[in-house]
Swiss-Prot record:
GO terms for biological process: SRP-dependent cotranslational protein targeting to membrane, translocation. CDD domains: SRP54_G. The lineage of its organism: Eukaryota, Metazoa, Porifera, Demospongiae, Heteroscleromorpha. Residues 1-294 are annotated as: NG-domain. SUPFAM superfamilies: Domain of the SRP/SRP receptor G-proteins, P-loop containing nucleoside triphosphate hydrolases, Signal peptide-binding domain. It is found in: Nucleus speckle; Cytoplasm; Endoplasmic reticulum. The keyword Ligase does not apply. Residues 295-499 are annotated as: M-domain. The gene is SRP54. PROSITE patterns: SRP54. Component of a signal recognition particle (SRP) complex that consists of a 7SL RNA molecule of 300 nucleotides and six protein subunits: SRP72, SRP68, SRP54, SRP19, SRP14 and SRP9. Its main location: nucleus. Its EC number is 3.6.5.4. It comes from Geodia cydonium. This is Signal recognition particle subunit SRP54.
Length: 499
Protein backbone atom coordinates (compact mmCIF):
# COMPACT_ATOMS: atom_id res chain seq x y z
CA UNK A 1 0.00 0.00 0.00
CA UNK A 2 1.68 3.18 -1.20
CA UNK A 3 -0.06 5.22 1.53
CA UNK A 4 2.26 3.37 3.91
CA UNK A 5 5.14 5.36 2.35
CA UNK A 6 3.48 8.50 3.69
CA UNK A 7 3.05 6.90 7.11
CA UNK A 8 6.66 5.75 7.18
CA UNK A 9 7.96 9.23 6.29
CA UNK A 10 5.87 10.90 9.01
CA UNK A 11 6.88 8.27 11.58
CA UNK A 12 10.55 8.67 10.61
CA UNK A 13 10.22 12.43 11.09
CA UNK A 14 8.92 11.86 14.63
CA UNK A 15 11.13 8.97 15.83
CA UNK A 16 14.82 9.98 15.38
CA UNK A 17 14.49 12.90 17.78
CA UNK A 18 13.58 10.71 20.76
CA UNK A 19 17.17 10.83 21.95
CA UNK A 20 17.58 14.51 21.12
CA UNK A 21 16.71 17.55 23.20
CA UNK A 22 13.54 18.78 21.48
CA UNK A 23 13.48 22.55 21.03
CA UNK A 24 12.05 25.04 18.55
CA UNK A 25 14.68 24.24 15.90
CA UNK A 26 14.06 20.48 16.10
CA UNK A 27 10.29 21.01 15.96
CA UNK A 28 10.61 23.11 12.78
CA UNK A 29 12.75 20.38 11.16
CA UNK A 30 10.17 17.73 12.10
CA UNK A 31 7.30 19.79 10.69
CA UNK A 32 9.24 20.43 7.48
CA UNK A 33 9.72 16.66 6.92
CA UNK A 34 6.08 15.91 7.71
CA UNK A 35 4.77 18.65 5.39
CA UNK A 36 7.12 17.54 2.58
CA UNK A 37 5.78 13.98 2.90
CA UNK A 38 2.18 15.25 2.70
CA UNK A 39 2.92 17.40 -0.36
CA UNK A 40 4.59 14.40 -2.06
CA UNK A 41 1.35 12.47 -1.41
CA UNK A 42 -0.46 15.23 -3.38
CA UNK A 43 -2.24 16.74 -0.37
CA UNK A 44 -3.41 20.29 -1.15
CA UNK A 45 -0.79 22.90 -0.23
CA UNK A 46 -3.34 25.02 1.68
CA UNK A 47 -4.38 22.02 3.80
CA UNK A 48 -0.72 21.22 4.53
CA UNK A 49 -0.05 24.84 5.52
CA UNK A 50 -3.03 24.79 7.87
CA UNK A 51 -1.85 21.53 9.48
CA UNK A 52 1.62 22.99 10.07
CA UNK A 53 0.15 26.15 11.56
CA UNK A 54 -2.18 24.22 13.89
CA UNK A 55 0.54 21.86 15.16
CA UNK A 56 2.84 24.80 15.81
CA UNK A 57 0.09 26.69 17.66
CA UNK A 58 -0.70 23.66 19.85
CA UNK A 59 2.87 23.35 21.16
CA UNK A 60 4.30 25.82 23.65
CA UNK A 61 7.64 24.68 25.08
CA UNK A 62 7.56 27.32 27.82
CA UNK A 63 4.21 26.16 29.23
CA UNK A 64 5.10 22.44 29.18
CA UNK A 65 5.25 20.89 32.65
CA UNK A 66 8.34 19.07 33.86
CA UNK A 67 8.38 15.35 33.09
CA UNK A 68 6.11 15.64 30.06
CA UNK A 69 7.31 13.90 26.89
CA UNK A 70 7.72 16.60 24.24
CA UNK A 71 7.95 13.98 21.50
CA UNK A 72 4.69 12.38 22.68
CA UNK A 73 2.93 15.78 22.72
CA UNK A 74 4.15 16.53 19.18
CA UNK A 75 3.11 13.05 18.00
CA UNK A 76 -0.37 13.49 19.52
CA UNK A 77 -0.74 16.92 17.93
CA UNK A 78 0.29 15.58 14.48
CA UNK A 79 -2.12 12.64 14.94
CA UNK A 80 -5.01 14.99 15.79
CA UNK A 81 -4.32 17.29 12.84
CA UNK A 82 -4.08 14.35 10.39
CA UNK A 83 -7.46 13.16 11.71
CA UNK A 84 -8.93 16.64 11.06
CA UNK A 85 -7.43 16.56 7.55
CA UNK A 86 -9.20 13.28 6.69
CA UNK A 87 -12.43 13.62 8.69
CA UNK A 88 -15.32 15.31 6.83
CA UNK A 89 -17.20 15.70 10.11
CA UNK A 90 -20.41 14.13 8.78
CA UNK A 91 -22.12 10.97 10.13
CA UNK A 92 -21.75 7.82 8.02
CA UNK A 93 -24.81 5.97 6.68
CA UNK A 94 -25.36 2.37 7.87
CA UNK A 95 -27.91 -0.16 6.54
CA UNK A 96 -30.82 -1.25 8.75
CA UNK A 97 -31.27 -4.94 9.61
CA UNK A 98 -34.53 -6.62 8.59
CA UNK A 99 -35.24 -3.93 5.98
CA UNK A 100 -34.46 -3.67 2.23
CA UNK A 101 -31.61 -1.14 1.94
CA UNK A 102 -31.15 0.03 -1.66
CA UNK A 103 -27.63 1.27 -2.47
CA UNK A 104 -26.95 2.97 -5.81
CA UNK A 105 -23.39 3.22 -7.18
CA UNK A 106 -22.30 6.14 -9.39
CA UNK A 107 -18.94 7.18 -10.83
CA UNK A 108 -16.79 7.65 -13.90
CA UNK A 109 -15.77 4.76 -16.15
CA UNK A 110 -12.55 3.06 -15.08
CA UNK A 111 -12.85 3.93 -11.39
CA UNK A 112 -13.45 0.29 -10.42
CA UNK A 113 -17.18 0.77 -9.81
CA UNK A 114 -18.43 -2.68 -10.86
CA UNK A 115 -15.71 -4.51 -8.94
CA UNK A 116 -16.41 -2.37 -5.86
CA UNK A 117 -20.14 -3.23 -6.04
CA UNK A 118 -19.25 -6.90 -5.65
CA UNK A 119 -16.74 -6.16 -2.89
CA UNK A 120 -19.40 -4.32 -0.88
CA UNK A 121 -21.96 -7.11 -1.41
CA UNK A 122 -19.36 -9.65 -0.28
CA UNK A 123 -18.46 -7.50 2.77
CA UNK A 124 -22.06 -7.39 4.01
CA UNK A 125 -22.65 -11.04 3.10
CA UNK A 126 -19.74 -12.07 5.35
CA UNK A 127 -21.38 -10.15 8.18
CA UNK A 128 -24.62 -12.11 7.83
CA UNK A 129 -26.64 -9.78 5.57
CA UNK A 130 -28.75 -11.08 2.66
CA UNK A 131 -27.12 -9.24 -0.27
CA UNK A 132 -27.63 -9.03 -4.04
CA UNK A 133 -26.51 -7.09 -7.14
CA UNK A 134 -28.41 -5.36 -9.97
CA UNK A 135 -26.60 -4.39 -13.20
CA UNK A 136 -28.20 -1.23 -14.62
CA UNK A 137 -25.10 -0.37 -16.70
CA UNK A 138 -26.26 -0.64 -20.32
CA UNK A 139 -23.69 1.83 -21.68
CA UNK A 140 -20.46 -0.19 -21.36
CA UNK A 141 -20.09 -3.34 -23.45
CA UNK A 142 -19.47 -6.33 -21.21
CA UNK A 143 -20.61 -4.62 -18.00
CA UNK A 144 -23.25 -7.26 -17.23
CA UNK A 145 -20.81 -10.07 -18.05
CA UNK A 146 -18.27 -8.60 -15.62
CA UNK A 147 -20.82 -8.20 -12.82
CA UNK A 148 -22.19 -11.69 -13.50
CA UNK A 149 -18.68 -13.20 -13.30
CA UNK A 150 -17.80 -11.30 -10.10
CA UNK A 151 -21.13 -12.11 -8.43
CA UNK A 152 -20.86 -15.81 -9.29
CA UNK A 153 -17.36 -15.94 -7.81
CA UNK A 154 -18.58 -14.23 -4.61
CA UNK A 155 -21.76 -16.37 -4.56
CA UNK A 156 -23.98 -13.28 -4.53
CA UNK A 157 -27.38 -13.35 -6.37
CA UNK A 158 -27.59 -10.91 -9.30
CA UNK A 159 -30.03 -9.44 -11.83
CA UNK A 160 -29.45 -7.98 -15.30
CA UNK A 161 -30.52 -8.22 -18.94
CA UNK A 162 -28.87 -8.77 -22.32
CA UNK A 163 -31.93 -7.46 -24.24
CA UNK A 164 -33.37 -4.55 -22.23
CA UNK A 165 -31.42 -1.35 -23.00
CA UNK A 166 -33.20 1.06 -20.64
CA UNK A 167 -31.20 1.21 -17.37
CA UNK A 168 -34.22 2.65 -15.49
CA UNK A 169 -36.37 -0.39 -16.36
CA UNK A 170 -33.62 -2.86 -15.37
CA UNK A 171 -32.94 -1.07 -12.08
CA UNK A 172 -36.66 -0.93 -11.23
CA UNK A 173 -37.31 -4.59 -12.09
CA UNK A 174 -34.20 -5.80 -10.23
CA UNK A 175 -34.92 -3.84 -7.06
CA UNK A 176 -38.61 -4.90 -7.01
CA UNK A 177 -37.67 -8.57 -7.52
CA UNK A 178 -35.13 -8.59 -4.68
CA UNK A 179 -37.43 -6.62 -2.34
CA UNK A 180 -40.11 -9.31 -2.87
CA UNK A 181 -37.51 -11.92 -1.88
CA UNK A 182 -36.67 -9.96 1.32
CA UNK A 183 -33.06 -9.11 0.45
CA UNK A 184 -31.53 -6.70 2.99
CA UNK A 185 -28.79 -5.05 0.89
CA UNK A 186 -29.65 -4.40 -2.77
CA UNK A 187 -26.72 -2.87 -4.68
CA UNK A 188 -27.42 -1.23 -8.05
CA UNK A 189 -24.51 -0.65 -10.47
CA UNK A 190 -25.17 2.21 -12.92
CA UNK A 191 -23.47 3.38 -16.13
CA UNK A 192 -20.23 5.33 -16.03
CA UNK A 193 -18.68 7.66 -18.61
CA UNK A 194 -15.15 8.62 -19.63
CA UNK A 195 -15.82 12.15 -18.39
CA UNK A 196 -18.44 14.18 -16.53
CA UNK A 197 -21.23 14.91 -19.00
CA UNK A 198 -24.91 15.85 -18.83
CA UNK A 199 -26.17 12.56 -20.32
CA UNK A 200 -24.53 10.68 -17.43
CA UNK A 201 -26.03 12.94 -14.79
CA UNK A 202 -29.47 12.80 -16.47
CA UNK A 203 -29.42 8.99 -16.48
CA UNK A 204 -28.29 8.89 -12.83
CA UNK A 205 -31.19 11.16 -11.81
CA UNK A 206 -33.74 9.01 -13.67
CA UNK A 207 -32.47 5.78 -12.07
CA UNK A 208 -32.36 7.46 -8.65
CA UNK A 209 -35.96 8.71 -8.96
CA UNK A 210 -37.14 5.26 -10.09
CA UNK A 211 -35.57 3.17 -7.29
CA UNK A 212 -35.44 5.78 -4.48
CA UNK A 213 -32.09 4.58 -3.00
CA UNK A 214 -31.35 4.76 0.73
CA UNK A 215 -27.71 5.57 -0.04
CA UNK A 216 -25.90 6.82 -3.16
CA UNK A 217 -22.23 5.85 -3.18
CA UNK A 218 -19.77 7.68 -5.43
CA UNK A 219 -16.79 5.49 -6.44
CA UNK A 220 -13.65 7.50 -7.06
CA UNK A 221 -10.27 6.60 -8.56
CA UNK A 222 -7.64 7.46 -5.90
CA UNK A 223 -4.84 7.77 -8.46
CA UNK A 224 -6.02 11.26 -9.53
CA UNK A 225 -5.01 12.71 -6.15
CA UNK A 226 -6.39 16.10 -5.11
CA UNK A 227 -8.30 16.36 -8.41
CA UNK A 228 -10.82 14.15 -6.56
CA UNK A 229 -12.18 17.30 -4.92
CA UNK A 230 -13.66 18.86 -8.08
CA UNK A 231 -15.02 15.48 -9.20
CA UNK A 232 -16.70 14.82 -5.84
CA UNK A 233 -18.21 18.32 -5.79
CA UNK A 234 -19.58 17.92 -9.35
CA UNK A 235 -21.36 14.67 -8.49
CA UNK A 236 -22.67 16.03 -5.17
CA UNK A 237 -24.25 18.99 -6.97
CA UNK A 238 -26.11 16.73 -9.41
CA UNK A 239 -27.19 13.77 -7.25
CA UNK A 240 -27.57 13.26 -3.52
CA UNK A 241 -24.23 11.52 -2.90
CA UNK A 242 -24.20 10.31 0.71
CA UNK A 243 -20.97 8.25 0.77
CA UNK A 244 -17.70 7.82 -1.10
CA UNK A 245 -15.47 4.80 -1.76
CA UNK A 246 -11.93 5.61 -2.92
CA UNK A 247 -10.33 2.84 -5.00
CA UNK A 248 -6.80 1.93 -6.18
CA UNK A 249 -5.02 3.15 -3.04
CA UNK A 250 -2.62 0.20 -3.18
CA UNK A 251 -0.50 1.34 -6.10
CA UNK A 252 -0.22 5.11 -6.33
CA UNK A 253 1.57 7.87 -4.44
CA UNK A 254 -1.39 10.31 -4.60
CA UNK A 255 -3.62 8.43 -2.14
CA UNK A 256 -3.20 10.98 0.66
CA UNK A 257 -4.28 13.77 -1.68
CA UNK A 258 -7.34 11.81 -2.77
CA UNK A 259 -8.52 11.13 0.79
CA UNK A 260 -7.97 14.69 2.03
CA UNK A 261 -9.62 16.15 -1.10
CA UNK A 262 -12.78 14.07 -0.60
CA UNK A 263 -12.92 15.04 3.08
CA UNK A 264 -12.75 18.71 2.02
CA UNK A 265 -16.07 18.24 0.18
CA UNK A 266 -17.65 16.97 3.45
CA UNK A 267 -18.41 13.59 1.87
CA UNK A 268 -17.82 10.68 4.26
CA UNK A 269 -15.46 8.01 2.92
CA UNK A 270 -16.90 4.65 4.00
CA UNK A 271 -14.42 2.21 2.38
CA UNK A 272 -11.05 2.28 0.61
CA UNK A 273 -9.99 -0.18 -2.08
CA UNK A 274 -6.55 -1.67 -1.43
CA UNK A 275 -6.25 -4.27 -4.20
CA UNK A 276 -7.99 -6.19 -6.97
CA UNK A 277 -9.19 -9.17 -4.93
CA UNK A 278 -12.69 -9.37 -3.50
CA UNK A 279 -11.56 -9.02 0.13
CA UNK A 280 -9.14 -6.14 -0.53
CA UNK A 281 -11.43 -3.37 0.64
CA UNK A 282 -11.29 -1.88 4.15
CA UNK A 283 -13.88 0.09 6.13
CA UNK A 284 -12.58 3.66 6.52
CA UNK A 285 -12.62 5.16 10.01
CA UNK A 286 -10.48 8.26 10.43
CA UNK A 287 -8.77 7.65 13.79
CA UNK A 288 -7.99 3.92 13.25
CA UNK A 289 -6.77 4.73 9.72
CA UNK A 290 -4.34 7.44 10.91
CA UNK A 291 -3.30 5.19 13.80
CA UNK A 292 -2.41 2.36 11.36
CA UNK A 293 -0.71 4.84 9.02
CA UNK A 294 1.64 5.89 11.83
CA UNK A 295 2.32 2.28 12.92
CA UNK A 296 0.23 2.68 16.10
CA UNK A 297 -2.13 -0.19 15.21
CA UNK A 298 -5.92 -0.56 15.31
CA UNK A 299 -6.81 -2.97 18.11
CA UNK A 300 -10.51 -2.06 17.86
CA UNK A 301 -10.55 -3.21 14.23
CA UNK A 302 -8.54 -6.34 15.06
CA UNK A 303 -10.92 -7.27 17.89
CA UNK A 304 -13.88 -6.69 15.55
CA UNK A 305 -12.43 -9.12 13.00
CA UNK A 306 -11.82 -11.71 15.74
CA UNK A 307 -15.35 -11.12 17.09
CA UNK A 308 -16.82 -11.71 13.59
CA UNK A 309 -15.41 -15.27 13.73
CA UNK A 310 -17.76 -15.98 16.71
CA UNK A 311 -15.10 -18.12 18.40
CA UNK A 312 -16.98 -17.91 21.70
CA UNK A 313 -19.86 -19.87 20.14
CA UNK A 314 -17.56 -22.89 19.67
CA UNK A 315 -18.07 -24.18 23.22
CA UNK A 316 -16.26 -27.45 22.51
CA UNK A 317 -13.07 -25.63 21.46
CA UNK A 318 -13.27 -23.20 24.40
CA UNK A 319 -13.63 -26.16 26.79
CA UNK A 320 -10.61 -27.86 25.21
CA UNK A 321 -8.51 -24.70 25.53
CA UNK A 322 -9.44 -24.40 29.21
CA UNK A 323 -8.08 -27.91 29.76
CA UNK A 324 -4.97 -27.38 27.61
CA UNK A 325 -6.14 -29.70 24.81
CA UNK A 326 -5.48 -29.00 21.13
CA UNK A 327 -5.82 -31.47 18.25
CA UNK A 328 -4.75 -31.29 14.62
CA UNK A 329 -8.41 -30.73 13.70
CA UNK A 330 -8.49 -27.72 16.05
CA UNK A 331 -5.43 -26.30 14.29
CA UNK A 332 -7.09 -26.86 10.90
CA UNK A 333 -10.14 -24.89 12.09
CA UNK A 334 -7.90 -22.04 13.28
CA UNK A 335 -6.22 -21.95 9.85
CA UNK A 336 -9.71 -21.62 8.33
CA UNK A 337 -10.42 -18.71 10.69
CA UNK A 338 -7.19 -16.98 9.62
CA UNK A 339 -8.29 -17.27 5.97
CA UNK A 340 -11.70 -15.75 6.87
CA UNK A 341 -10.12 -12.71 8.54
CA UNK A 342 -8.94 -11.38 5.17
CA UNK A 343 -5.56 -10.34 3.69
CA UNK A 344 -2.59 -10.69 6.08
CA UNK A 345 -1.52 -7.09 5.42
CA UNK A 346 -4.83 -5.77 6.80
CA UNK A 347 -4.39 -7.84 9.98
CA UNK A 348 -0.68 -7.00 10.41
CA UNK A 349 -1.38 -3.26 10.06
CA UNK A 350 -3.84 -3.47 12.98
CA UNK A 351 -1.14 -4.65 15.40
CA UNK A 352 0.66 -1.78 17.20
CA UNK A 353 4.25 -1.39 16.00
CA UNK A 354 3.61 -2.69 12.47
CA UNK A 355 3.22 -0.59 9.36
CA UNK A 356 0.58 -1.65 6.79
CA UNK A 357 3.33 -2.57 4.29
CA UNK A 358 5.25 -4.81 6.74
CA UNK A 359 4.47 -7.76 4.46
CA UNK A 360 4.83 -7.21 0.71
CA UNK A 361 2.14 -8.40 -1.71
CA UNK A 362 4.49 -11.18 -2.87
CA UNK A 363 5.19 -12.34 0.68
CA UNK A 364 1.49 -12.20 1.51
CA UNK A 365 0.60 -14.43 -1.44
CA UNK A 366 3.43 -16.79 -0.47
CA UNK A 367 2.16 -16.99 3.13
CA UNK A 368 -1.40 -17.72 2.00
CA UNK A 369 -0.11 -20.41 -0.38
CA UNK A 370 1.86 -22.02 2.49
CA UNK A 371 -1.22 -21.99 4.70
CA UNK A 372 -3.30 -23.66 1.96
CA UNK A 373 -0.53 -26.26 1.49
CA UNK A 374 -0.61 -27.09 5.22
CA UNK A 375 -4.40 -27.49 5.03
CA UNK A 376 -4.04 -29.76 1.98
CA UNK A 377 -1.75 -32.05 4.01
CA UNK A 378 -4.30 -32.14 6.83
CA UNK A 379 -7.05 -32.97 4.31
CA UNK A 380 -5.14 -36.22 3.66
CA UNK A 381 -5.22 -37.23 7.34
CA UNK A 382 -7.93 -39.56 8.70
CA UNK A 383 -10.31 -38.79 11.59
CA UNK A 384 -8.23 -40.78 14.06
CA UNK A 385 -5.15 -38.65 13.30
CA UNK A 386 -7.00 -35.32 13.29
CA UNK A 387 -8.78 -36.03 16.60
CA UNK A 388 -5.91 -37.73 18.47
CA UNK A 389 -5.05 -35.82 21.71
CA UNK A 390 -1.37 -35.86 20.68
CA UNK A 391 -1.20 -36.12 16.91
CA UNK A 392 2.55 -35.43 16.71
CA UNK A 393 3.32 -38.35 19.04
CA UNK A 394 1.08 -40.68 16.99
CA UNK A 395 2.95 -39.80 13.77
CA UNK A 396 6.40 -40.14 15.38
CA UNK A 397 5.53 -43.66 16.63
CA UNK A 398 4.26 -44.73 13.20
CA UNK A 399 6.37 -43.02 10.45
CA UNK A 400 4.33 -44.73 7.73
CA UNK A 401 1.48 -42.31 8.46
CA UNK A 402 3.57 -39.29 7.37
CA UNK A 403 4.53 -41.07 4.13
CA UNK A 404 0.84 -41.83 3.42
CA UNK A 405 -0.20 -38.19 4.06
CA UNK A 406 2.64 -36.92 1.82
CA UNK A 407 1.52 -39.20 -1.04
CA UNK A 408 -2.13 -38.22 -0.63
CA UNK A 409 -1.40 -34.46 -0.60
CA UNK A 410 1.33 -34.36 -3.25
CA UNK A 411 3.89 -33.12 -0.72
CA UNK A 412 7.04 -34.54 0.89
CA UNK A 413 7.51 -36.35 4.20
CA UNK A 414 9.77 -33.46 5.28
CA UNK A 415 6.89 -30.98 4.79
CA UNK A 416 4.52 -33.21 6.78
CA UNK A 417 7.07 -33.37 9.61
CA UNK A 418 7.41 -29.54 9.54
CA UNK A 419 3.61 -29.28 9.88
CA UNK A 420 3.71 -31.64 12.89
CA UNK A 421 6.49 -29.54 14.45
CA UNK A 422 4.32 -26.41 14.12
CA UNK A 423 1.42 -28.32 15.65
CA UNK A 424 3.64 -29.35 18.61
CA UNK A 425 4.55 -25.67 19.21
CA UNK A 426 0.89 -24.61 19.10
CA UNK A 427 -0.10 -27.50 21.35
CA UNK A 428 2.61 -26.62 23.91
CA UNK A 429 1.34 -23.02 24.06
CA UNK A 430 -2.27 -24.19 24.52
CA UNK A 431 -1.17 -26.48 27.36
CA UNK A 432 0.45 -23.49 29.07
CA UNK A 433 -2.70 -21.43 28.51
CA UNK A 434 -4.84 -24.20 30.01
CA UNK A 435 -2.69 -24.13 33.13
CA UNK A 436 -3.23 -20.40 33.71
CA UNK A 437 -6.14 -19.86 36.08
CA UNK A 438 -8.44 -16.99 35.15
CA UNK A 439 -7.30 -16.73 31.50
CA UNK A 440 -10.74 -17.72 30.17
CA UNK A 441 -12.86 -15.87 32.73
CA UNK A 442 -13.02 -12.69 30.64
CA UNK A 443 -13.09 -9.22 32.17
CA UNK A 444 -9.83 -7.68 33.38
CA UNK A 445 -7.21 -10.35 32.68
CA UNK A 446 -4.61 -8.30 34.54
CA UNK A 447 -6.57 -8.99 37.76
CA UNK A 448 -7.58 -12.59 36.96
CA UNK A 449 -4.20 -13.94 35.82
CA UNK A 450 -1.02 -14.57 37.80
CA UNK A 451 1.67 -12.21 36.32
CA UNK A 452 4.44 -14.85 36.43
CA UNK A 453 2.25 -17.33 34.51
CA UNK A 454 1.43 -14.66 31.92
CA UNK A 455 5.15 -13.90 31.54
CA UNK A 456 5.83 -17.61 30.83
CA UNK A 457 3.08 -17.62 28.20
CA UNK A 458 4.61 -14.53 26.54
CA UNK A 459 8.01 -16.28 26.47
CA UNK A 460 6.44 -19.34 24.83
CA UNK A 461 4.80 -17.12 22.19
CA UNK A 462 8.10 -15.31 21.56
CA UNK A 463 9.80 -18.66 20.82
CA UNK A 464 7.16 -19.44 18.19
CA UNK A 465 7.45 -16.08 16.44
CA UNK A 466 9.58 -15.09 13.48
CA UNK A 467 12.53 -13.08 14.96
CA UNK A 468 11.89 -10.34 12.36
CA UNK A 469 8.32 -9.97 13.61
CA UNK A 470 9.42 -9.91 17.27
CA UNK A 471 12.03 -7.23 16.50
CA UNK A 472 9.42 -5.09 14.65
CA UNK A 473 7.24 -5.26 17.77
CA UNK A 474 10.06 -4.00 19.98
CA UNK A 475 11.25 -7.32 21.45
CA UNK A 476 9.76 -9.02 24.50
CA UNK A 477 8.65 -5.72 26.09
CA UNK A 478 6.78 -4.82 22.88
CA UNK A 479 5.08 -8.24 22.81
CA UNK A 480 4.04 -7.89 26.47
CA UNK A 481 2.67 -4.39 25.80
CA UNK A 482 0.69 -5.64 22.79
CA UNK A 483 -0.73 -8.54 24.85
CA UNK A 484 -1.82 -6.11 27.58
CA UNK A 485 -3.59 -3.91 25.00
CA UNK A 486 -5.18 -6.97 23.40
CA UNK A 487 -6.42 -8.18 26.81
CA UNK A 488 -7.93 -4.74 27.56
CA UNK A 489 -9.59 -4.71 24.13
CA UNK A 490 -10.90 -8.26 24.61
CA UNK A 491 -12.43 -7.45 27.99
CA UNK A 492 -14.50 -4.67 26.34
CA UNK A 493 -15.73 -6.71 23.37
CA UNK A 494 -19.02 -8.67 23.33
CA UNK A 495 -18.33 -12.40 23.21
CA UNK A 496 -15.02 -12.11 25.08
CA UNK A 497 -16.46 -11.61 28.55
CA UNK A 498 -17.11 -14.38 31.02
CA UNK A 499 -20.62 -15.80 31.22
Amino acid sequence: MVLADLGRKITTALLPRQRTVINEEVLQAMLKEICTALLEADVNVKLVGKLRQNVRAAIDFEDMGAGLSKRRIIQTSVFNELCKLLDPGVPVWHPTKGHSNVIMFVGLQGSGKTTTCTKLAYHYQKKGWKTCLVCADTFRAGAFDQLKQNATKARVPFYGSYTEMDPVVIAQEGVEKFKEDSFEVIIVDTSGRHKQEESLFEEMLQVSQAIDPDNIIFVMDGTIGQACESQARAFKEKVDVASVIVTKLDGHAKGGGALSAVAATRSPIIFIGTGEHIDEMEPFKTKPFVSKLLGMGDLEGLMEKVSDLKLDENEELMDKLKHGQFTLRDMYEQFQNIMKMGPFNQIIGMIPGFSPDFMSKGNERESMAKLKRLMTMMDSMNDGELDHPNGAKLFSKQPGRAARVARGSGTSVREVNELLKQYSNFSATVKKMGGIKGLFKGGDLGKNVNPSQMAKLNQQMAKMMDPRVLQQMGGMSGLQNMMRQFQQGASNMPGFKGK
